[in-house]
């Protein structure tokens, strides 16, 4: 569906060239929700704006739906952009137009006749849950409602791809989840390919099938979300995963326990998929003559399944602890020894 091959974007500046995107290679399948995550300055906004040619690549090739979009211009590019919707962090609505008129705007530009425009706007207002707000102006809407207008407007021309540029960054957590649920519903109903960029791992976890991690203009890691949660390869990816799997006081809790109980081992168990539902600790205590203390636990739901992390203290004879660890491995649960006495 979407293919990026050796794509580079360089900005010219008085202080020297700035490479925002450095030889990016990506393949995004039709109908999937693909996330790009990175901290500020990683190059993710520059990357997503290359998809619809709001930014021109310095080199490389971008193909969307078998069309080399990086090689077209003029009317052909304008037509291609109608098949690529986009929503933004700060909504980019026309403040002098009502909700209906904002949604209708791209249809006017496309030359759709008035009757068809009205019908399409009615469909979109229903789709995004804005019934009764069609005659309201943006200033009368909440942040979540404004983004719903943005989504409806982006879908007006029945695009194949929806680009989301930090679409939830300006929203509170509850509204963020509502917008993410809406995007997930639209993806399932319409089979729409969604590409989103964010700095929040929660967004990736909640709706994405796969994720690419960017750092200093480079894509440093790519994979299914569940695999990235289970086995992050890069330090930056590990930091993002820890946003969800480790509470802020985990290290303090572990350090306090080590001081209080210098014997035994502190281990982190990682559960993936079906392993989350297994009674691992119950089995551990049944077959091992050791004491088990739970320090911290977390279970996250991703679009591909569950991921869990549990930090426990194992205390007893060394041989019994080793047998317990071997038993945990047999349950297909990953184990990391954090500290040992």
UniProtKB/Swiss-Prot annotation:
The keyword Transport applies. Residues 2-241 form the ABC transporter domain. It comes from the Bacteria. GO terms for cellular component: plasma membrane. The keyword Nucleotide-binding applies. Belongs to the ABC transporter superfamily. Methionine importer (TC 3.A.1.24) family. PANTHER family: AMINO ACID IMPORT ATP-BINDING PROTEIN (PTHR43166), METHIONINE IMPORT ATP-BINDING PROTEIN METN 2 (PTHR43166:SF36). The complex is composed of two ATP-binding proteins (MetN), two transmembrane proteins (MetI) and a solute-binding protein (MetQ). Part of the ABC transporter complex MetNIQ involved in methionine import. Responsible for energy coupling to the transport system. This is Methionine import ATP-binding protein MetN 3. It comes from Bacillus cereus (strain ATCC 10987 / NRS 248). The gene is metN3.
């Amino acid at each position: 569906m979407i293919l990026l091959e050796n794509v580079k974007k360089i900005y010219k500046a008085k202080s020297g060239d700035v490479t925002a995107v450095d030889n990016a290679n990506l393949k995004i399948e039709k109908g999937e929700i693909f996330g790009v995550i990175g901290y500020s300055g990683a190059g993710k906004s520059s990357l997503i704006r290359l998809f619809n040619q709001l930014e021109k690549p310095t080199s490389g090739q971008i193909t969307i739906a078998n069309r080399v979009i990086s090689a077209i211009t003029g009317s052909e590019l304008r037509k291609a952009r109608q098949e690529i919707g986009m929503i933004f962090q700060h909504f980019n609505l026309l403040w002098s137009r009502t909700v209906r008129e904002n949604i209708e705007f791209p249809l006017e530009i496309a030359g759709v006749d008035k009757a068809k425009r009205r019908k399409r706007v009615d469909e979109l207002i229903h789709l995004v849950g804005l019934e009764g707000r069609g005659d309201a102006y943006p200033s009368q809407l909440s942040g979540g409602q404004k983004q719903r207008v943005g989504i409806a407007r982006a879908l007006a021309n029945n695009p194949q791809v929806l680009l989301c540029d930090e679409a939830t960054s300006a929203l509170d957590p509850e509204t963020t989840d509502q917008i993410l649920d809406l995007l997930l519903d639209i993806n399932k109903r319409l089979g729409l390919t969604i590409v989103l960029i964010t700095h929040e791992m929660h967004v990736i976890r909640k709706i994405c099938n796969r994720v690419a991690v960017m750092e200093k203009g480079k894509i440093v890691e790519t994979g299914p979300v569940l695999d990235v949660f289970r086995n992050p390869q890069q330090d930056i990816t590990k930091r993002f995963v820890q946003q969800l799997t480790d509470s802020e006081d985990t290290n303090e809790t572990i350090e306090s326990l080590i001081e209080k109980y210098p014997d035994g081992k502190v281990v982190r168990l990682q559960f993936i998929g079906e392993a989350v539902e297994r009674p691992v600790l119950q089995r551990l205590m049944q077959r091992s003559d050791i004491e088990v203390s739970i320090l911290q636990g977390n279970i996250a739901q991703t679009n591909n399944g569950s991921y869990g992390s549990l930090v426990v203290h194992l205390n007893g004879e060394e041989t019994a602890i080793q047998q317990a660890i071997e038993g945990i491995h047999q349950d297909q649960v990953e184990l990391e020894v954090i500290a040992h006495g």
